[in-house]
Amino acid sequence: MKDTPKHQGLRNQLVTVLQQKGITNKNILEAISKIPRHLFLNSSFEDYAYQDLAFPIGAGQTISQPYTVAFQTELLEVKKGDKVLEIGTGSGYQTAVLCMVGAVVYSVERQNELFKKTSLLLPKLGIRAKHLSFGDGYKGLPNYAPFDSIIVTAGAPEIPKALMAQLKIGGKLVIPVGENSQIMTLIIRKDETQFEKHEFGDFKFVPLLEDKN
């Protein structure tokens, strides 16, 4: 599959939709206008790639809808050079958005099939994550901690303590929390022991599975 002017036109329309839904961060909108989302999907979904929808990507996983990607990224308030941990690399689309807004991205994926596929795809598209790894997202990446931000792209029944421990003071963790539908939750680390919690509307995510490797 190629990236054509038609795809660019569809991306521009998607950016307009996201703006109408309340996304305002210019860097995020620019990233979404540039990243060829259709290349992260099975070719059978190509015609729908720039609709604001989630799609299956294999291994029981989905690529989140663009609004969710933009919303989570906006909550992190990523600055250029921020060290960001992503739990659930999946298709690599969220990874690409983070890289494009200037983050130094460390990403973990627990499905080997997706890990291999995405590890090959991102470099082909000129997207350079700092570190991609195969493993249990619940544990984070303690060897590379602390992080300015942590983004979790799968629903979790509760907030993993290991991830909270890997945040810098002042760092932000964005995670969908809940069993059936999830509440988008923002955790800000105030000091060694204090964390501030903010909750945003309901979202639907595949579950974050523990110890599945």
UniProtKB/Swiss-Prot annotation:
Its EC number is 2.1.1.77. Keywords: Cytoplasm, Methyltransferase, S-adenosyl-L-methionine, Transferase. GO terms for cellular component: cytoplasm. It is found in: Cytoplasm. Signal peptide: none annotated. GO terms for biological process: methylation; protein modification process; protein repair. It holds the Pfam family PCMT. The keyword S-adenosyl-L-methionine applies. The active site is at 64. InterPro entries: PCMT, SAM-dependent_MTases_sf. The keyword Transferase applies. It is an enzyme of class 2 (transferase). GO terms for molecular function: protein-L-isoaspartate (D-aspartate) O-methyltransferase activity. It catalyses: [protein]-L-isoaspartate + S-adenosyl-L-methionine = [protein]-L-isoaspartate alpha-methyl ester + S-adenosyl-L-homocysteine. Belongs to the methyltransferase superfamily. L-isoaspartyl/D-aspartyl protein methyltransferase family. Catalyzes the methyl esterification of L-isoaspartyl residues in peptides and proteins that result from spontaneous decomposition of normal L-aspartyl and L-asparaginyl residues. It plays a role in the repair and/or degradation of damaged proteins. This is Protein-L-isoaspartate O-methyltransferase.
